[in-house]
């Protein structure tokens, strides 16, 4: 019970993720087969659909945009300021901050991670490990999107008796960039709105919000 309580946030979103993927697989299969019947093409079973490039491409489109959002957000909040937002550092804390405030090197505590106590490349990798992980996930999922999107695009071309293209050509194809950019703009809108909304709006008890009674121009504070 203690484990569930201490990890309830990650478990909650993990369950939502699995549930959403299952729901998407059935809804997507229904739509795919409906389109196939309209064009007098063969339909898919559920298993064939979830292992297809059509389903994989749709999933990766969403994943890569989420990882891009957080990669840019993590990096931009190091150097950029939004006055009054709980999502921004205070003006005096912008930048990489001091070793003392970051508890690294000789300022590390007894229970600090070992690499925070180290120096050189190990510390550099660890103090940038979050942005490195998010960036790796973004490029990995974007690469997977391109492969699945390319295969799905060529499958559609063959169904319509039209010429196929190479994977390299697909990177310059409007289909690839339409799929990418329509996801990116929604992520930029959401994260930008969050930064501005937290200036004036509150959610009692949430670490994503300032305390209810905090001034609108108070920057870099949260519950």
What are these regions (language model features)?
Residues 39-49, 95-96, 160-173, 214-217:
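Short, motif-level signal for alpha-helix interfacial/capping segments enriched in acidic residues
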Residues 5-12, 16, 22, 36, ...:
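N-terminal first transmembrane alpha-helix
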Residues 1-18, 120-136:
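Alpha-helical transmembrane segments and their helix-start/interface "positive-inside/aromatic belt" motifs
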Residues 26-43, 149-162:
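Interfacial/capping segments of alpha-helical transmembrane domains
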Residues 105-140, 147, 152-153:
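Domain-level detector of nuclease and nuclease-like folds
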Residues 1, 44, 85-121, 205-223:
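Extramembrane terminal tails and long inter-domain/linker segments of multi-pass membrane proteins
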Residues 48-81, 86, 138-154, 162, ...:
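A structural feature that tracks compact, well-ordered secondary-structure segments
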Residues 17-32, 141-145:
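Alpha-helical transmembrane segments of multi-pass membrane proteins
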């Amino acid at each position: 019970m203690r484990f569930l309580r201490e990890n309830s946030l990650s478990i909650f979103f993990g369950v939502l993720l699995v549930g959403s993927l299952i729901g998407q697989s059935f809804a997507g299969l229904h739509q795919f087969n409906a389109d196939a019947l309209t064009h007098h093409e063969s339909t898919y079973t559920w298993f064939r659909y979830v292992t297809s490039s059509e389903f994989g491409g749709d999933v990766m489109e969403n994943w890569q945009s989420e990882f891009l959002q957080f990669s840019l957000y993590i990096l931009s909040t190091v150097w950029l300021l939004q006055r009054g937002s709980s999502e921004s550092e205070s003006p005096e804390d912008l930048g990489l901050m001091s070793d003392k405030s970051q508890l690294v090197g000789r300022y590390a505590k007894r229970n600090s991670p070992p690499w925070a106590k180290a120096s050189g490349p190990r510390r550099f990798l660890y103090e940038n490990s979050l942005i490195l992980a998010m960036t790796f996930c973004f490029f990995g999922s974007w690469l997977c999107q391109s492969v699945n999107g390319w295969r799905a695009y060529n499958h559609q071309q063959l169904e319509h008796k039209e010429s196929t293209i190479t994977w390299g050509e697909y990177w310059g194809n409007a289909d690839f960039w339409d799929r990418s950019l329509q996801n990116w703009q929604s992520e930029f809108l959401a994260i930008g709105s969050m930064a501005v909304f937290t200036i004036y709006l509150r959610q009692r008890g949430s670490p994503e919000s300032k305390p209810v009674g905090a001034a609108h121009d108070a920057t870099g504070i949260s519950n």
